[in-house]
């Protein structure tokens, strides 16, 4: 034990001695060293004396090496002055290479340092505030990513396969997204803004964690069983359930609330970034660049099914985007400023949908079967709910924000509607499961029913929002805008870009089943146009 400590102390002293020798002044003589060492020897024990002797030996070796180096340099200088090519003499080359070696001596042979710290394993990028920890991780805005299929977020990277990271921290395991202020702790669990969850598929409320599977706690109290929706102050907590505006859920087919993204399959991204694979919507400032890939605001993606978020990307299929971008595949609901993009998806807040069985937004009515009319006029056929200015009048119709619904699996949001299976989110929050839309201040709670903060839905697959209705078998429209076509919903200011991809707010898409953004029309089949231009395909009513 004592010898181990002495050995460690000797190593430390030797290291310090080597450093001092390298920085030792040239003009100081060895005699002064010996005098100072002899003065200290009387104050030291036997172990210390042996250490000091070792240090003196090291210094002596260093001094000898320094003298030999000086003699070598002087000899080379004399030879260089005597040689005809003295401008490019070997001495000068030796000096320059010595300077280069000194500058790079501290660098490791295969290590690149991140802008704020080094990464720690293969294909790992470091986030702006912390590194991720496994393969297929995209790097944050301060460093590059390192492997295929990785999207880099403008301010934060994801942390493993199919995981999107929140804007300020990385996730830590598979299919887990981290909330904006803390990391999750197990598979498919997203953490709420103020605390972590504790088991699988559990989302935490803004003020406390839940305690069992598939249960989310409300901001003021927990729910008690599966498929239970929470009140206006907290989210539900089981599979396919979307979380309320103050925290994200954490399992499959769950959309995240406005403060953080989820991290596994069929998960919608939080308010600061888009999803990132096939049928993925593009971020708010640029178009996508390959099959179903959207490009982020600060750079392009690099392989298929990768989208880069403006501030953070999601990472897998069936992901809906939060309040700043649209989602891009089946059964995905979009957040408050962008629409989803496929069948049975509700559209975001600023434009109408454009195909069969789609409800129209608050600024115009739809024109086909099973479509609910917006706040300015009623619909006229079966299974249609009326907007906020009047009630519907037949079976399976939900009433507006001043009355409750009356049948299965539909929730109405305070400011936006649900729809049915894979239905859209209300104007301020996303839906969360197979057929649930989330209300403006709270989420749904079971397989097909979430009730809004001020009123319920009204029929088998349609819930009407306070200012706009849903529109067909699987599509509910948001309070001010509709969905877009068979598989694409357009964002509030821009269109999607491929077969199941919605584009972000500043660039259009270019292929089938793409909806056009608010500033220009689309040009191919099954494309819905945004709020300022007409569509032009087979199944579009505007």
From Swiss-Prot:
Domain of life of the organism encoding this protein: Eukaryota
Record-linked Pfam families: PSGP
PTM characteristics: Most sialic acid residues exist in the form of polysialyl groups partly capped with deaminoneuraminic acid.
Composition-biased stretches (Polar residues): 78-95
Region (32 X 13 AA tandem repeats of D-D-A-T-S-E-A-A-T-G-P-S-G): 121-536
Tissue specificity note: Cortical alveoli of immature ovaries.
Biased composition (Low complexity): 107-116
Residues of this chain annotated as glycosylated in UniProt: 124-125, 129, 137-138, 142, 150-151, 155, 163-164, 168, 176-177, 181, 189-190, 194, 202-203, 207, 215-216, 220, 228-229, 233, 241-242, 246, 254-255, 259, 267-268, 272, 280-281, 285, 293-294, 298, 306-307, 311, 319-320, 324, 332-333, 337, 345-346, 350, 358-359, 363, 371-372, 376, 384-385, 389, 397-398, 402, 410-411, 415, 423-424, 428, 436-437, 441, 449-450, 454, 462-463, 467, 475-476, 480, 488-489, 493, 501-502, 506, 514-515, 519, 527-528, 532
Keyword vocabulary terms for this entry: Glycoprotein, Repeat, Signal
Propeptide: 22-120, 537-542
Sequence repeats: 121-133, 134-146, 147-159, 160-172, 173-185, 186-198, 199-211, 212-224, 225-237, 238-250, 251-263, 264-276, 277-289, 290-302, 303-315, 316-328, 329-341, 342-354, 355-367, 368-380, 381-393, 394-406, 407-419, 420-432, 433-445, 446-458, 459-471, 472-484, 485-497, 498-510, 511-523, 524-536
Matches recorded under InterPro entries: PSGP
Note: The core of the PSGP protein contains an average of 25 exact tandem repeats of the same glycotridecapeptide, where the Ser and the Thr residues are attachment sites of a polysialylglycan chain.
Role summary: In response to egg activation, PSGP is discharged by exocytosis into the perivitelline space, where it undergoes rapid proteolysis into glycotridecapeptides. During fertilization and/or early development the glycotridecapeptides prevent polyspermy or are involved in the formation of a fertilization membrane.
Protein name per Swiss-Prot or TrEMBL: Polysialoglycoprotein
Native organism: Oncorhynchus mykiss (Rainbow trout)
Lineage, broadest ranks: Eukaryota, Metazoa, Chordata, Craniata, Vertebrata
């Amino acid at each position: 034990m004592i010898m181990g400590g002495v050995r460690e102390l000797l190593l430390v002293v030797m290291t310090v001695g080597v450093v001092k020798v390298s920085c030792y002044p040239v003009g100081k003589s060895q005699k002064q060293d010996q005098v100072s060492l002899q003065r200290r020897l009387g104050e030291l024990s036997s172990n210390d004396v042996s250490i000091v002797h070792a240090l003196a030996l090291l210094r002596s070796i260093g001094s000898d090496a320094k003298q030999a180096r000086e003699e070598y340099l002087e000899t080379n200088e004399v030879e260089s002055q005597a040689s005809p090519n003295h401008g490019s003499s070997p001495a000068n080359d030796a000096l320059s290479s010595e300077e280069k070696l000194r500058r790079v001596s501290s660098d490791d042979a295969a290590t690149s340092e991140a802008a704020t710290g080094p990464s720690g394993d293969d294909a790992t990028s470091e986030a702006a505030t912390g590194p991720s920890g496994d393969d297929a991780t995209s790097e944050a805005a301060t460093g590059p990513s390192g492997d295929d299929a990785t999207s880099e977020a403008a301010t934060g990277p994801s942390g493993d396969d199919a995981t999107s990271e929140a804007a300020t921290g990385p996730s830590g395991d598979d299919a887990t997204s981290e909330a904006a202020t803390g990391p999750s702790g197990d598979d498919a669990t997203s953490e709420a803004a103020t605390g972590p969850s504790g088991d699988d598929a559990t989302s935490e409320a803004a003020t406390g964690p839940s305690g069992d599977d598939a249960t989310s706690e409300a901001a003021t109290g927990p729910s008690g069983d599966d498929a239970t929706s929470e009140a206006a102050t907290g989210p539900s907590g089981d599979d396919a359930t979307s979380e309320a505006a103050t925290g994200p859920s954490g399992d499959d087919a769950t959309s995240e609330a406005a403060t953080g993204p989820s991290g596994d399959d069929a998960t919608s991204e939080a308010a600061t970034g888009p999803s990132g694979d096939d049928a993925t919507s593009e971020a708010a400032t640029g178009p996508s660049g390959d099959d179903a890939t959207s490009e982020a605001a600060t750079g392009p993606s690099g392989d298929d099914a990768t989208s880069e978020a403006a501030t953070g990307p999601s990472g897998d299929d069936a992901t809906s985007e939060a309040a700043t971008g649209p989602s891009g595949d089946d059964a995905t609901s979009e957040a408050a400023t962008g629409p989803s993009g496929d069948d049975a998806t509700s559209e975001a807040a600023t434009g109408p949908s454009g195909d069969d069985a789609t409800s129209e937004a608050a600024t115009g009515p739809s024109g086909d079967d099973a479509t609910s009319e917006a706040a300015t006029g009623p619909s006229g056929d079966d299974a249609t709910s009326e907007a906020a200015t009047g009630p519907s009048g037949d079976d399976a119709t939900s009433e507006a924000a001043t009355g409750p619904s009356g049948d299965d699996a539909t929730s109405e949001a305070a400011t936006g509607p649900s729809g049915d299976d894979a239905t859209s989110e209300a104007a301020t929050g996303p839906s969360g499961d197979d057929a649930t839309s989330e209300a403006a201040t709270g989420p749904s709670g079971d397989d097909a029913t979430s009730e809004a903060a001020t009123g319920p839905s009204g029929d088998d697959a349609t819930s009407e929002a306070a200012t706009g209705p849903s529109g067909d078998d699987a599509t509910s429209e948001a309070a001010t805008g509709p969905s877009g076509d068979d598989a694409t919903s357009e964002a509030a200011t821009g269109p999607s870009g491929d077969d199941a991809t919605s584009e972000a707010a500043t660039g259009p898409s270019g292929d089938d089943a793409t909806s056009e953004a608010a500033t220009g029309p689309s040009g191919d089949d099954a494309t819905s146009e945004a709020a300022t231009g007409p569509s032009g395909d087979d199944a579009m009513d505007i």
